[in-house]
């Protein structure tokens, strides 16, 4: 078994899973797994708390010198862990497989240690970060003259303002569109009524004309 982030077959970045922890909210961390060999390498991700995390993909095959992204999602939690300390751990197993092997073709004993094949393992620790910690880090960076942090905050604020303006404009356009629809419906309703009146007047005229014709045609 190799150390954190170290593996003879693959490289893993980052070497620690860090999640922004907020109650009733999901959080995720992406792992980049790169194949460092000229062979096809299969991998499998295991965790000590499988009900707490959602891993996709948790099993896969990486082509030679290629890489893939594994997304580990922390499910929404209802309470804070003691002292915000996380004892969860992840284990990433990897082994060489025949060329052009598909993940659906992997035998059940691919990641079994007594299968006679070389199986390397890499442990990953888990840590939680609170929003307040992130905010303090940003403020500390600004205090130390980190212009990039202040620039990032300004960018976020600008994006929020643009989003609010776009939402307001969308609502205004929807209101105007609804007004146009109401006016058009009223106009169509008025035109329908006018046509009905015209039809009735025409019908009455025909009846009167028919009666007059009969009257004139009657012998005196």
Swiss-Prot record:
Name of this protein: Vesicle-associated protein 2-1
Subcellular location as annotated: Endoplasmic reticulum membrane
Record bears the keyword Cytoplasm: no
Cellular component GO terms, alphabetical: endoplasmic reticulum; endoplasmic reticulum membrane; plastid
Role played: May play a role in vesicle trafficking.
Family: Belongs to the VAMP-associated protein (VAP) (TC 9.B.17) family.
Gene name for this UniProt entry: PVA21
UniProt keyword Protease, yes or no: no
Residues bearing PTM N-acetylmethionine: 1
Coiled-coil annotated residue ranges, if any: 153-188
Regions that span the bilayer: 197-217
Membrane topology label: Single-pass type IV membrane protein
Segments forming domain MSP: 9-129
Origin species: Arabidopsis thaliana
A Pfam family reported for this protein in Swiss-Prot or TrEMBL: Motile_Sperm
Cytoplasmic side: 1-196
Predominant subcellular localization, coarse grouping: endoplasmic reticulum
Annotated segments matching region Disordered: 133-154
Annotated positions of the N-acetylthreonine modification: 2
UniProt keyword annotations, A-Z: Acetylation, Coiled coil, Endoplasmic reticulum, Membrane, Transmembrane, Transmembrane helix
């Amino acid at each position: 078994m190799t150390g954190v982030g170290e593996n003879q077959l693959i490289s893993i970045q980052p070497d620690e899973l860090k999640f922004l922890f907020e109650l009733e909210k999901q959080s995720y961390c992406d792992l980049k797994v790169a194949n460092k060999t000229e062979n096809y390498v299969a991998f499998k991700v295991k965790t000590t708390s499988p009900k707490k995390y959602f891993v996709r993909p948790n099993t896969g095959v990486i082509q030679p010198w290629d890489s893939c992204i594994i997304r580990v999602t922390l499910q929404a939690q209802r309470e804070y862990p003691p002292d915000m300390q996380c004892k969860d751990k992840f284990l990433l197993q990897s082994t060489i497989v025949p060329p052009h092997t598909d993940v659906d073709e992997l035998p059940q004993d691919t990641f079994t240690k007594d299968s006679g094949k070389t199986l390397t393992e890499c442990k990953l620790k888990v840590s939680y970060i609170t929003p307040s910690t992130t905010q303090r880090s940003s403020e500390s960076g600004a205090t130390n003259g980190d212009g990039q942090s202040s620039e990032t905050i300004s960018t976020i604020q600008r994006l929020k303002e643009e989003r609010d303006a776009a939402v307001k404009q969308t609502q205004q356009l929807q209101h105007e569109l609804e007004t146009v629809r109401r006016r058009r419906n009223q106009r169509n309703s008025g035109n329908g009524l006018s046509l009905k009146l015209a039809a009735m007047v025409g019908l009455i005229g025909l009846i009167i004309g028919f009666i007059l014709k009969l009257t004139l045609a009657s012998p005196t």
